[in-house]
């Protein structure tokens, strides 16, 4: 089942978070950054890819300073519907706390010329552990990279 880990961690009768829905239409790929006041304040970077939001928790948040490297821990995929989520996840639920949209927009691979080539290059980068992308957001803009720090681990670095 797609989004199995996401679904297993949530009690949808007790949280306002969205359930996974049907597929989505093709076009430009979206990104969203959530500011999440959970047990510890952090930011969640979510990139639309393969019909879901690939997600990383970024404890110190993204930076526009190229000299800074930010830890980014890959977490479970989220449903595409999560792109619009803001609200309070009630106490006792996974990820309880306040969630707001901090930034959103579109993103693409820096060398892609078509939508098909874009997703292909992004997927290749994700699988290789070196994902390069250009954000076109309200706050974040320019070229970024997510670089995996081990061969199969969940720890990545977010670089500008």
Q: What are the roles of these predicted feature ranges?
A:
Residues 1-160:
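A charge-rich, low-complexity, intrinsically flexible signal that marks solvent-exposed coils, linkers
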């Amino acid at each position: 089942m797609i989004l199995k880990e996401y679904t297993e961690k949530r009690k949808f009768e007790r949280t306002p978070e969205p359930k996974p829905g049907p597929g989505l239409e093709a076009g430009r790929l979206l990104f969203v950054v959530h500011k999440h006041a959970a047990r510890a304040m952090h930011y969640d970077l979510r990139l639309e890819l393969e019909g879901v939001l690939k997600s990383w928790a970024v404890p110190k948040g993204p930076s526009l300073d190229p000299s800074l490297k930010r830890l980014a821990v890959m977490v479970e995929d989220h449903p595409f519907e999560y792109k619009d989520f803001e609200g309070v996840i009630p106490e006792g639920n996974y990820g309880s706390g306040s969630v707001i949209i901090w930034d959103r927009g579109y993103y693409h691979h820096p060398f892609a010329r078509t939508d098909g080539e874009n997703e292909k290059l992004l997927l290749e980068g994700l699988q290789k552990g070196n994902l390069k992308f250009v954000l076109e957001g309200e706050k974040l803009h320019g070229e970024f990279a997510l670089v995996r720090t081990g061969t199969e681990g969940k720890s990545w670095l977010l670089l500008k």
